[in-house]
Structures are given as structure tokens and as C-alpha cells.
Amino acid sequence: MLFGRLTERAQRVLAHAQEEAIRLNHSNIGTEHLLLGLMKEPEGIAAKVLETFEITEEKVVEEVEKLIGHGQEQMGALHYTPRAKKVIELSMDEARKLHHNFVGTEHILLGLIRENEGVAARVFANLDLNITKARAQVVKALGSPEMSNKNAQANKSNNTPTLDSLARDLTVIAKDGTLDPVIGRDKEITRVIEVLSRRTKNNPVLIGEPGVGKTAIAEGLAQAIVNNEVPETLKGKRVMSLDMGTVVAGTKYRGEFEERLKKVMEEIHQAGNVILFIDELHTLVGAGGAEGAIDASNILKPALARGELQCIGATTLDEYRKNIEKDAALERRFQPVQVDEPTVEDTIEILKGLRDRYEAHHRINISDEALVSAAKLSHRYVSDRFLPDKAIDLIDEASSKVRLKSHTTPPNLKEIEQQIEQVKNEKDAAVHAQEFENAANLRDKQTKLEKQYEEANTNWKNTQNGDNTSLSEEDIGEVIAGWTGIPLTKINETESDRLLNLEDTLHNRVIGQKDAVTSISKAVRRARAGLKDPKRPIGSFIFLGPTGVGKTELARALAESMFGEDDAMIRVDMSEFMEKHAVSRLVGAPPGYVGHDDGGQLTEKVRRKPYSVILFDEIEKAHPDVFNILLQVLDDGHLTDTKGRRVDFRNTVIIMTSNVGAQELQDQRFAGFGGATEGQDYESIRKTMMKELKNAFRPEFLNRVDDIIVFHKLSKDELKQIVTMMVNKLTNRLSEQDINISVTEAAKEKIAEEGYDPEYGARPLIRAIQKTVEDNLSELILDGNQIEGKEVKIDHDGKEFKYDITERQDSAKDKETSES
């Protein structure tokens, strides 16, 4: 905080506040201690104003001790609470509004009056201080010396009226203390000062990615000028931020824009102490250049070359390349200063420097752990933006979330409010019906409820103190999870159990295939526990095996268990990428081709849902060039689309399915469904499939995959379990039409027998159920049989399927009840 601008008396107030906090054994300096500090300076304007309202030091001490009392023995250094920081900030704002150069006790009092939360505000309320009158009294006590300051300031900048109307004076804003501190950019600021001190072409341009802090460097220069931390050549200079949009705005006729810009240049030249800062420098090119008129860049070129105009520009790398570099004459007048993205460690230091501002604004405490977490998590999971901007945004939003959460009215208060409203309506109705005795009772009840509400509200406000609210790592994790969809909060007990039992969850949908389910579950657990390689996807797998054994179903089951729905899976059918030219559809069409603006089918989906299961189905059907694209996804966890955007695959599970080798197996006719030699047969199947896989795909592709899993053929027992699962699904569908079905074990055995085919896995079962159950049921429904509300029992007597329709027990009971 900028304590350097405080008067001696105001500094003594802060010292008294610290003494009072120590006396009361409090661990922090809050608004109440600032108020006590003001009362300890009886000669100050603040104490005199409060005295006119009969507020004395004794009364304030009594109220403070009554509200918060004495604490335990305090340990360690004292720190200002977020609300106290906010009061100091508000007092500086009051001084600025009154055009005072220093902050006195009167400004601190105005800050306390404006801060309508905290202990000091409650003291004022308890002592019946009229806030509006107190403020007016302070302004009256000050008299109006600010007018002379205002006039002096107007005269000071009177020689640049046009510039003042179009630009912001960063040095004045820096003097007021409203600019955020600039941390860790000494090297860049020094380079800017060196370029500005040249004789000609003294125009630095700050080039860097969006959000790395280019504008902050210009603000840092303004602060350095205010603090006299610059060479003699720059002392007394004004840094003026010019917005080209403001210059162009309102210039209706030809020549108006040029005249306005020329006037600004003349004022800068005559003043001799102005450094122009143009954010978004590329807007110079073409600005005001309609219908053949000269644009802003060409008007400025002569002055920039001769050194008559000192200009700092700021623009992104892309805009500099597109707009500035193509105009060689403009480019040579600017000296590029590269602004690199800060490291995570530098970002943490920047966040620590900004902490006071955000604590004061949100009135919460921000822990060191939250700052470290914001820098690290934003760097790791928000890949399309740059530090420190994304980390600062994360802290800001998380603080806002915590602040709002702590100020939400509790349910018990809302309930009492509703009761009061209900009683009020009943009372009005009773009065309207001339039931005065009932109305009197309701009035008493309303009074009692209102008193209860006041007590509950007071208790809530006493316990809900923003100074005790703090921002934690967990809050940061919640916000970034909301941004990206990636779960980053601490693993709670429920989720821990779910992850540990993931195999059981997957086996509810996928029968058999223990190896595949275990391998996938381990990869998900590693990722959620934070142990996976941060530069690679969560897991990448190739599922091999004959058709119909559950390869695609396992991917669907994983998507449902991770996200709660099958739709969370991104499915890419590789049969659509059989031609060489179709490969570009994954990352987007090249420039000049139809669909370039639409983005890639794969990259766009992953950009929108970075935490997902990606299924590449039937990969052997795709053109070999597809696998060249997947190499860097599997190894580095990212892919660049046709627009140059980097798409992050580090939080995806990549599953590729293939039937390669299935034909070879069919030809060799291995034994498949159980038996004594099932283990030996599986090993033979595995060897055959791996051999075929190595023939079909390149070694550098296979070497990047985490695990290659060969699925087992399905046994008869497993097929029977699948029949049960399919029947359950059919039962659920029919229950929507109020039809119950039950299938006997004999019927299930027959369905499994009819759907048994070693070569095609479980898919023939679907056809068997359609043929034996669904077709006959649909005929029963359409044939006029009223089977709604009835039970259909499906059995097999050894020759054919039997359908026994009976009244449901529950519907029979309902019928009896309605008749009685």
C-alpha cells in the first residue's frame, strides 16, 4: 500500500491503530482499529468532526470492546485486513476526488464512512452516526482549498488541451496511486528508457503475446517517472496514453481527422515533456485513411524519424507482423522491445505484488498457497492464454466467487422472510374479512417473527466477517475446473471410492475383458491423483480383438463413468478417412479450401471439451497419413490446427480400436469360447494379432501407445450375462409404456444359444433378441391385446417361446381400491 502519501498525522493514526490492535490482543489491524487510531488524534479533522456528533474516544472504545472484545495472546507480525486495505484505498480515492496531494485523517474518515461493512461501520450504526451529514461536515471542515489545486492542475496542462481531451495521463494516475504495481519487468523498462533517450528514432515498440504485460511496462515507466527513478533526460515527463479510436471518433468530414492529429502532434512538440503511448499500435495503419486520405501512420512518420515525437507502442507479434513489418518505412522508426511471457516463479511474485489490491477490492484474504496454485494450474491447464494475465484473471474470479458465497443470505433467514410474508398476507386477508381478533393474533405473530429475523440477521452478520474469509487452493481448483471442465478440486471421499471401484463400474456395462478394464482404470486413477506425465495424454490404448467383444462399448462405459453420459465421448469413425485428402478434415481444411473457417473435426471438439474420451474406431480402415498426425498427439499431447492454434490433448483418454488380425484368426480357427486350453489359445491369439498389428502400423506409432490390449473372445457364461443386460434394457424401455416383462432362465439360455457365434461376438445376440422377443411383443401390442398395465412372462418350453399375459399385482390392488 502507498503509505508514502500520508500526512504525519495520518501516519500517527496508523501507528495508533497498530497499538490498539496489540492492546486488544488482535492478530490483524481492522477498520475498528483505524477508527480508534483516528480518535487518538484529537487535533485531527476526523476526531473534531466526530466530536460534533457526540462520538468520543470512550464511546468508540466501549463499542469496539462490546462488539469484538479482547483476543487471545497474539503471535507474530500484524497485518491489515482486506477491509482495512480497502479503507486506505478509498481514502486515497477521496483525496484524489478532492484534488489533495496527501491523505489526511479526514480522508481516512471518509474512507471509513464509504466502507459500509466491517466493525467500524457497525460502531457508527450503534452510535447513530448520520453518514450523509458526517460526510458533508468533513467537506465543510476542509473548506475549499481543492479548487486552487484544481485550477493549478488545469493551468499546468493548459498547453495541451487537445491531447488532454483525447488521452489519459498515466503519470497523474500513477501519482494518485491507482495503477497496479509492476513487478519483474526491470529489464524491459530499462530497455525502453534507453531507446527513449536516443537522439532520433527514440520510439520503442513493445512486442509480445496477448496478456504478457506490455501495457503494464508503460505504466511501470510512468510510476518510475513519478518516483524519480529515471535518468535526468526523462524527469518531469508525462506519459500520455492515446486511444486511436477516440481520435477518429466524430471526424465526419474529410480533413477533420488529419487536423486533429496534427494539432495533437504540435501540442506534443511545443510542450516538449510528453511521451506518447499508443496501445494496439497496429491501429495506426489505415486509421482515418478512407477515400484515399493519408492514414495516421503516414502523418506520424516524419515526426517519429526526426525525434520530435517520443512514442511508445504496444502490439502483439501477429499484428506487428501483419501491419507494421509490411510497411518498412514505419517499422524502421520503431525499435522493437521483446516482452516474453514470465515464468511460473515470476508470475507468483507478480501475484504477490498485486495481492493487496485484490484483497482490498474483494475484502477477503488471499493465501500464498492460492497464489502458487493459480500460477501453476493456469500454466498447466489454460494453454491458449498467457501468464500472468490468465493467473490474475483466475485469482480475480475465484476471489469474486468466495466473496459472493460468503455474502449469500442463509436458508434460515430466507425461511423466516417467507413466513413473515405469509403471515402479513393472512393478516391483510383477516382485516379484509373483518376478523379483527384473528388479525390481532397474526399481528403479534408477525412482530415475533420480525424480532426473530432481526436477531438471526444480527448473529449472521456478526459471524460472517469478510476479514476471516480467505481464498484457498480448493477455490482456485473449482474455478479452473469451471473454465476447462477438468476436475482439479481435491478428491473427496465419494470420488475416491468411485475411482477405486472404477473397474466394478465399467464391468456393469462391459462383460469380461478384465485386462482392458484394469489398464484403463489405472490410467484414470493416475491422472486424477496428479501422477501422470503432464506432457502426455492421460492414457493411449489400442484395443484389438474380433468384432463384437466390447471394444467400443468399453470406451462408451468409460465416458459415462467419467462424465455421466455417453455423449461426452468424441468418436471419430476412421472409415471416413480412407482417402489421403480426407486427413486434413481432422485439423481443418488448408487456406483457400472450402471449410477453412470451420476448423478441424477433431481439433475443434477437443478445444471445446479438453477433458474427454476420444475414440478412433476401426483405425485400420484409415489412410496411413492419419497416424503421422497422431504421432505428436501421443507423444507431446498437443496438435496444431490449420489456423496455427495449439490444441491441448493432455487431458484426454485416447482409445483406438482395430479388428486387424481377425481374418487371420478366423482362417486359423482357434478355439475361442472357454475350455481347458483357453489361456493357451488366448496367448496364440495375442501373438497372431500383435504380428498383424506390426505389419499394419509403423513402429514409431506403436511405440508411442501406452498399452496394446487384446480382447478375449466371449464365453457362453459371459454371453448369458450380456443377454440379462439386454433384457434389462428392454424392460426399462417397456416400463415407459406401463408394460412389465419377465424372462425365465430357460428363455435366456435359448436366446444365448441362438445368438452364439464365435466369430461375431455379442452382436448376433441383438438380432436374436429382436427376432425372439421384440418382434413377438410388437405384434402383441399392435394386435389389439391390451397389455398395458399387465405383466408378460416369456418362457421357452424346449420347442418354442411362450408368452403368458397376466394382471400385474399392483394394478389389481389399485383396481380393488377404486371399486371399494
From Swiss-Prot:
Q: What is this protein called?
A: ATP-dependent Clp protease ATP-binding subunit ClpC
Segments of this protein annotated with the region Repeat 2: 80-144
Extract the PROSITE patterns matched here. CLP_R, CLPAB_1, CLPAB_2, UVR
- Classification via InterPro entries: AAA+_ATPase, ATPase_AAA_core, Clp_ATPase_C, Clp_N_dom_sf, Clp_R_dom, ClpA/B, ClpA/B_CS1, ClpA/B_CS2
Q: Where is this region: II?
A: 471-662
The record's Gene Ontology cellular component field reads: cytoplasm
Q: Does the UniProt entry include the keyword Lyase?
A: no
Report which gene this protein is encoded by.
clpC
Main function: Required for growth at high temperatures, probably by acting as a chaperone during heat shock and targeting heat-denatured proteins for degradation by ClpP.
Indicate yes or no for the key word Chaperone: yes
